[in-house]
Amino acid sequence: MSYLFTSESVSEGHPDKVADQISDALLDQFLAYDSHARTAIESFVTTGQVVIMGEVRSEVYIDLQTIARKTINKIGYTKADYQFDGNSCGILTAIHEQSEDINRGVDRQDEDEQGAGDQGMMFGYATNETDNYMPVSLDLAHLIMRTLADIRKEGKVMTYLRPDAKSQVTVEYSDDGHPQRIVTIVVSTQHDDFDADENRMLAKIKDDVKNILMPRVKAQLGEKELKLFKGEIDYKVNPTGKFVIGGPHGDTGLTGRKIIVDTYGGKGAHGGGAFSGKDSSKVDRSAAYAARYVAKNMVAAGVADEMLVQVSYAIGVAEPINIYVNTYGKSHVNMTDGEIAKVVGEMFDLRPKAIERMLKLRQPMYFETAAYGHMGRKNEVVEKTFTSHYHPTKTMQVELFTWEKLDRVDEIRRVFGL
């Protein structure tokens, strides 16, 4: 019997994502001027107020307030009407130095033996149901949100849009786990109060979502995803009606509260650790990226149609405690999942410092991850410029989403005889 599966995404203007982007913008600023910086930065946003908290170990001083304000304005919170804007919000900072007890457990004379920054288990997942090896429900939900933000920033149509928005996509799967069609698309978007007649205002937004937003979304899809737009799709647009009050004024935002949006939309598994604001010594982040890198390359190589990879650590210990693989019965090699996991451990060095080197995680590459998902994104090199009241302006080439590279596929095929 067929079944339905749902994933959601949120816009860069969602309050939790505002907090994530502030945390990662600050991380990037530290890394731009001190590639060895260690950070664990949490941000909190509410009506007219930002609180920045956490632990940092760095040789440089960063103007936290300036970076936070620039980030908020870049997202689109620039008007006093929003009750939260980058120019006028209050900003309270409470940053202190990282615990020496943690430093002693992580630092080693031989940096290859750098210990994990914490205990925990991390997961990576990949499926061949889309070209970027992501669940189709999440991939489409992200694309809807990115496209809506593009329309808002262009300011040519749907000029009533405000930054906060959410999407949700439900997909029907066949008995054997293949996506068949899109069943429901939910879009909730914040908007100006542009018509005294609420029914007419809602009708306009619904019409624009169907006739402006969705055609632009479809124009960006590959053949696999376009085939799913068949039959009657139930569009639910702003189901509560009016959505004028939103963003941090409507709901308090906090770093790390959208961990399923950030990863696989409910597919696979999640170890519970958030990403934003954390440098790569924190395996919550770096090992989750490495596990995605392993899973994606393994699926792309044809080892399985779908794969979940778990890796776990003890604080202060470099070697992983375990590596686990689940191919969901979709393996194409004559090996058990346990045997596949053993080969993964032999092929991939998953010690924290090795992961940093393998994925080039000491670059200021994190702001771009903080909205629209950390996984399934485009690996590319971009030029980024960092300015500071305390340091010279710095322009550098930064490689983004290194864990999305498919540079181990040929090696994996040789090892597995594919």
Give, region by region, the residue ranges found by the protein language model.
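A short glycine-rich, hydrophobically flanked beta-strand micro-motif that places a catalytic Asp/Glu
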Residues: 37-41, 165-171, 233-237, 303-314
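Glycine-rich, mobile lid/loop segments that gate access to catalytic sites or pores
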Residues: 6, 66, 73-245, 371, ...
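Conserved phosphate/anionic-ligand binding catalytic regions in large, soluble enzymes, centered on
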Residues: 8-10, 14-19, 115-130, 244-269, ...
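Glycine-rich anion/phosphate-binding loop at the beta-strand->alpha-helix junction
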Residues: 196-300
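Internal helix-turn-beta structural module
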Residues: 46, 306, 313-418
